[in-house]
């Protein structure tokens, strides 16, 4: 049976990114986004909160490589309340969260007061999470949870792994969740950061040791370095990831989920064929719903220190804060208050 598409409602307020004939991107804060500009979907969501992710910051600052089409509303995360639906699983009044599936990249995303989505892409927000907290988890928390699950899947355990697990970009969004999750599971965690002034924050989250990013980057450019880590959760890519792979112990596991430090990987096969190191890629965009539901249930059971992890901003301020996200100077999670 074909589902009825959602009807039109009042105008939407949000960020609108367009492109000129040369491909140059520009962003506008609009209060008059017409409903016919929102596309289609079988669930209409009144967005209450979104978050400012690295991809969103790239889009808002006109950087190429994220948006697959324009004009577009950015925002790869959205949390809010269903206003109208033809999907019986998500009746009006349901609280839902959306991450990935190309929203904010090739179809309109969550940095606007209304979002038209497909029910098959939605997750019901667990009762233990507020809508704001669900947005805080969003892509960042889900990515960290996937990375931790990858380590566990490859038999990395705190009781059999005497060496710590390294987390790069530890003071950022994904890194903060990763440090907390690993510590709560009993792992010893080495938090790697470019901002050692956040040492108290990282220790509060559960890090055993805080290490400067420059210290890792200054390690010799060798195929194999002394075995320092049983596992790695990396958000940086580039030279930093290469040094961490070279420092991973025998049978260790490295989960890579970002490229804030570069998309290249200047390493060799030596760690993989001489130490049996496993490199796992973490894709948070197109994970099946079964995986999403399982990990969201797990995240909802955790007692995250939200007051320490969240920075709240207004929707109109997203463009101003975006360069700070790209520069890596925001701590924890930037949550965007979108609507009432």
Residue spans for each PLM region:
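Glycine-rich beta-strand-centered segment in the early N-terminal region that forms part
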Residues: 36-51, 63-103
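Glycine-rich phosphate-binding loop and adjacent beta-alpha segment
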Residues: 239-304, 339-340
């Amino acid at each position: 049976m074909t589902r009825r598409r959602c009807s039109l409602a009042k105008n939407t307020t949000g960020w609108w990114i367009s492109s000129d004939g040369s491909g140059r991107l520009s962003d506008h804060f609009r209060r008059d986004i017409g409903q016919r500009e929102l596309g289609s979907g079988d669930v209409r969501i009144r967005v209450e909160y979104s978050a400012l992710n690295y991809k969103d910051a790239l889009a808002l600052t006109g950087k190429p490589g994220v948006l697959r089409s324009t004009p577009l509303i950015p925002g790869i995360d959205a949390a809010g309340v269903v206003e109208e639906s033809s999907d019986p699983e998500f009746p009006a009044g349901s609280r839902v969260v959306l991450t990935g599936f190309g929203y904010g990249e090739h179809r309109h995303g969550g940095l606007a007061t209304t979002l038209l989505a497909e029910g098959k892409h939605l997750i019901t927000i667990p009762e233990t999470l507020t809508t704001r907290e669900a947005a805080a988890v969003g892509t960042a928390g889900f990515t960290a949870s996937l990375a931790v699950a990858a380590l566990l899947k490859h038999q990395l355990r705190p009781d059999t792994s005497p060496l710590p697990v390294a987390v790069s970009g530890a003071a950022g969004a994904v890194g903060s969740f990763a440090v907390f999750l690993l510590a709560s599971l009993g792992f010893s965690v080495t938090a790697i950061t470019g901002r050692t002034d956040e040492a108290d924050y990282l220790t509060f989250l559960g890090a055993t040791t805080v290490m400067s990013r420059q210290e890792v980057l200054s390690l010799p450019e060798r195929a194999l370095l002394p075995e320092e880590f049983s596992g790695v959760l990396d958000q940086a890519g580039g030279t930093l990831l290469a040094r961490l792979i070279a420092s991973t112990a025998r049978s260790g596991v490295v989960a890579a989920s970002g490229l804030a430090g570069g998309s290249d990987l200047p390493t060799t096969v030596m760690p993989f064929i001489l130490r049996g190191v496993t490199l796992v890629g973490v894709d948070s965009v197109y994970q099946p719903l079964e995986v999403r539901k399982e990990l969201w249930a797990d995240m909802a059971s955790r007692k995250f220190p939200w007051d320490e992890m969240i920075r709240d901003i207004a929707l109109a301020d997203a463009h101003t804060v975006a360069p700070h996200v790209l520069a890596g100077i925001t701590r924890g999670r930037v949550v965007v208050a979108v609507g009432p």
